Curated annotation (Swiss-Prot):
Xref: Pfam families: Mito_carr (PF00153)
Solcar repeat placement: 15-93, 104-190, 201-287
Top-level division of the source organism's lineage: Eukaryota
Gene Ontology BP term (one): mitochondrial citrate transmembrane transport
UniProt-listed InterPro entries: Mit_carrier (IPR002067), Mitochondrial_sb/sol_carrier (IPR018108), Mt_carrier_dom_sf (IPR023395), TXTP-like (IPR049563)
Family: Belongs to the mitochondrial carrier (TC 2.A.29) family.
Name of this chain's protein: Uncharacterized mitochondrial carrier C19G12.05
Subcellular locations according to the entry: Mitochondrion inner membrane
Species of the source: Schizosaccharomyces pombe (strain 972 / ATCC 24843)
Keywords: Membrane, Mitochondrion, Mitochondrion inner membrane, Repeat, Transmembrane, Transmembrane helix, Transport
Gene Ontology cellular-component annotations: mitochondrial inner membrane; mitochondrion
Example of a GO MF term: citrate secondary active transmembrane transporter activity
Topology of this chain in the membrane: Multi-pass membrane protein
Membrane-spanning residues: 21-41, 70-90, 108-128, 169-189, 201-221, 259-280
């Protein structure tokens, strides 16, 4: 009996896979519902091409900025669920007997989470979202929503149409998760070490730590994100042979700074995103802890 009493508290402190999936899914859905306009602006700016010196333009703020939102809400909740489940699973397998994770192993866990979410969830949903946003620039847009856009893309391009830009998406998410989780865990552990063992970081502090992790992530990974968006545009199959060819054309035709196009709205989103996702995730995990 005494053995059971000692081991149960320890095991209950470790997040199970179901709890990670639920907490990650809830966090992802709430985050994108709040930050989607910034995602729309980022994607539109990344899809802009230099044509006779014209400047990139965004439509007046309104419902137009929520085109493709339903697609991303579903995709983001699934993505976050897969990301946190994968990260927690990999982290658990790489941790020492005290549950501690070294810096390099944290990076490895983050990279693994990024690859998992890219292949299983993100690429198809990102392809549909980007196609819907890109389609809105046309005189007579065809794509109206997630299901209808999915049918058209699959009908015209096959299943491979949903996986356009897979390599760039995997690279971006691996880099995103590697940088983001490493920054978040490093800062969090540093701050937590200054507190008593039984005291947790406040909600405000957790939000700020997540926001800082988001800022670091944006500037490290924006070039890959721009290539990904271009590879998932409606004209990608006619313009680019692969992600490397796409990056070369952006560099030679639009210049080096074009790789950071859309960085400002993405930064705005990830500052909020990092704070919202990690804060909601931690809170949901606390709520689920007794179960």
């Amino acid at each position: 009996m005494s053995t059971v009493a000692k081991t149960n508290p320890k095991s209950s402190n470790k997040p199970g896979p179901v709890k990670s999936i639920i907490a990650g899914g809830v966090a992802g859905a709430i985050e994108i519902s709040i930050t989607y306009p910034a995602e729309f602006a980022k994607t539109r700016l990344q899809l802009y091409r230099n044509v006779e010196g014209t400047k990139a333009k965004l439509p007046p703020f309104g419902l137009e900025w929520y085109r493709g939102c339903s697609t991303v809400i579903v995709g983001n909740s699934l993505k976050a669920a897969v990301r946190f489940f994968a990260f927690d699973s990999i982290k658990k397998s790489l941790s020492d007997e005290h549950g501690h994770l070294t810096g390099p192993r944290t990076v490895l866990a983050g990279l693994g989470a990024g690859v998992a979410e890219s292949v299983l969830v993100l690429t198809p949903f990102e392809s549909i979202k980007t196609a819907i946003i890109d389609d809105r620039k046309r005189p007579n847009p065809r794509l109206k929503g997630f299901l209808q856009a999915s049918r058209i893309i699959v009908h015209e391009n096959g299943i491979r149409g949903l996986y356009r830009g897979l390599a760039a998406t995997v690279a971006r998410q691996a880099a995103n998760s590697g940088v983001r989780f490493t920054a978040y865990n490093s800062i969090k552990q540093s701050l937590q070490s200054r507190l008593p063992p039984d005291e947790k970081l406040s909600t405000v502090t957790t939000f700020l730590v997540g926001s800082v992790a988001g800022i670091i992530t944006v500037y490290c990974t924006q070039p890959i994100d721009t290539v990904k968006s271009r590879m998932q545009s409606l004209s990608a199959s006619k313009e680019y042979k692969n992600s490397i060819h796409c990056a070369y054309k952006i560099l030679t035709q639009d210049g080096l700074l074009r790789f950071w196009s859309g960085a400002t709205p993405r930064l705005a989103r990830l500052i909020l995103s990092g704070g919202i996702v990690f804060t909601v995730y931690e809170k949901v995990m606390e709520i689920l802890k007794p179960f």
